Amino acid sequence: MLTRIGGLLRQAESTDNPHEAEAFMEAAQRLATATSIDLAVARSHNASREKQVAPAQRVIRIGEAGKKGLRTFVKLFLVIAFANDVKCDISQSSTQVFAYGFDSDIDTCEALYSSLLIQMVRASDTYIKSGAYRNETAVRTVTETIGRKKYKRQEVVVVAGVTARLNFQTAFAERIGKRLESVKQEAETKAIEEESRGAGTAVVLRNKAIELKDFYTSTSKARGSWRSQSANAGYSRGARAAGDRAGRAARLGGEPELGRGSTQLGR
């Protein structure tokens, strides 16, 4: 399955036509979803509980502690995981993600993430170097303390490069998530309508979701919540729009084989 997906991703990478690239990417996600359904049906037919494949936990390394922008990297992995039936916990430092799911689904997530991470960073670098964000202003709320009282006021500021980058990458990840989820839903709907697999596909998918939820609940030790952006992160409308466009045009692949490639960017 990964080899076939790899072929689709290489086709997406090699074409200069954005519509073809999008079609190949969606085909890759469609194949991943169809394979995931087939494996779920196969598991439901396995009468031997001892040999039945079960969900597992895997640690995904995102980056080194202190590295800027890790939250948007995590955000990208999360949207990919959501579209591929994988639940996640995030370390407080955002340096790693704990992925919960079936091995084949986690493999798909790692493959997609490795390709899209590079594209997201390259696209945001190009945007920042263009200087387009420097023409944009934003309204920032500032809290001042005078005596014993605190006052809030708003001021207009020029969008900083770090703010533009974070907004760009956040919008990129959100658009990718929407694209992958749309393809997944279409593939699942088609499989349920066809019902040619000999088993109630809808029931199988529901049982898979329940099994994963039970595994996650019994295994996860996560406490608290995680935010994709810090509380003081600014907002850039222009960077968001640019990131969304890049997410629409994103291609996958570029690797000779799909597998567990590196999920960290070298610097």
Show the residue positions of the predicted features.
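Short amphipathic alpha-helical coiled-coil/interface segments
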Residues: 5, 21-35, 169-176
